[in-house]
């Protein structure tokens, strides 16, 4: 999908559509991690059909996220434009060209070879290589991560130690400066959580345990600041998983 040139430079205002174009991304982030992080951050706005990011030099620092409807794309732009992502603020706008997955769905898809015949400037081997790169790296989300983001079982299904009755829940920890976050997709990285929690004053760090995926500890300077963050992000969705946030036990 050759979208990069279309979104660079000036031009008339782009009509709202279901694909967003993101630039000013951190070029040091590995491609696989970048796609997973983008999926984790943007899936809260709606179903994602495809995420495109390429390793070629002229595509660095850019990505395209294809939603299944325009409303999701519009909300994502409104909420996430200028949002800090891997230490850089994302620049987001509507994509100027339609993705292949959308074109195939609405019947307007034209195979790459036919398109080339109508181009004023022949691309030759260069365009062929770009298309090959797009095919290799622009993987649909449905095929890239089947079953990876499995939801944690409901708390009611978690076995209790020592035969404790499930109708006797353990007393919650008193308010403190460290939050305990549960029900995370197992592929969630510390950076994704840092991007979510760093917008709250007093944020210090995220700690995750490699042997126990799906949980994390987030530390703030004091309990008032951790409480504000908990209230703001309680139930926030990463993939289809709603975060469950409580105070950590000390």
Curated annotation (Swiss-Prot):
Disulphide connectivity of cysteines: none
SUPFAM superfamilies, A to Z: RNA-binding domain, RBD
Residues making up the signal peptide according to the UniProt record: none
Cell compartment(s), UniProt: Nucleus, Nucleolus
Region (Disordered): 108-139
Any GO MF annotation of the entry: RNA binding
GO biological process, alphabetically ordered: mRNA splicing, via spliceosome
GO cellular component, one term: spliceosomal complex
Biased composition regions of type Basic residues, renumbered to the chain: 113-129
Assembly description: Component of the spliceosome where it is associated with snRNP U1.
Protein name: U1 small nuclear ribonucleoprotein A
Species of provenance: Arabidopsis thaliana (Mouse-ear cress)
């Amino acid at each position: 999908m050759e979208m990069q040139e279309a979104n660079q430079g000036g031009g008339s205002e782009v009509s709202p559509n279901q694909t967003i174009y993101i630039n000013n991304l951190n070029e040091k982030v590995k491609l696989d991690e970048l796609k997973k992080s983008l999926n984790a951050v943007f899936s809260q706005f709606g179903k994602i059909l495809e995420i495109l990011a390429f390793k070629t030099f002229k595509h660095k620092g850019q990505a395209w996220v294809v939603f299944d409807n325009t409303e999701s794309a519009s909300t994502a732009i409104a909420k996430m434009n200028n949002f800090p992502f891997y230490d850089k603020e994302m620049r987001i706008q509507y994509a100027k060209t339609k993705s292949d997955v959308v074109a195939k769905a609405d019947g307007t898809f034209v195979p790459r070879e036919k398109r080339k015949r109508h181009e004023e400037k022949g691309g030759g081997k260069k365009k062929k290589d770009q298309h090959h790169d797009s095919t290799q790296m622009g993987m649909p989300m449905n095929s890239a991560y089947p079953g990876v983001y499995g939801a944690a079982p409901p708390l009611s299904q978690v076995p209790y130690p020592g035969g404790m009755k499930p109708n006797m829940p353990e007393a919650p920890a008193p308010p403190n400066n460290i939050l305990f976050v549960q029900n995370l997709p197992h592929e969630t990285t510390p950076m994704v959580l840092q991007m979510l929690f760093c917008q709250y004053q007093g944020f210090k760090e995220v700690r995750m345990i490699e042997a126990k995926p799906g949980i994390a500890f987030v530390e703030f300077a004091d309990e008032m600041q951790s409480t504000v963050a908990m209230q703001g992000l309680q139930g926030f969705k990463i993939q289809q998983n709603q975060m469950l946030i409580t105070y950590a036990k000390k």
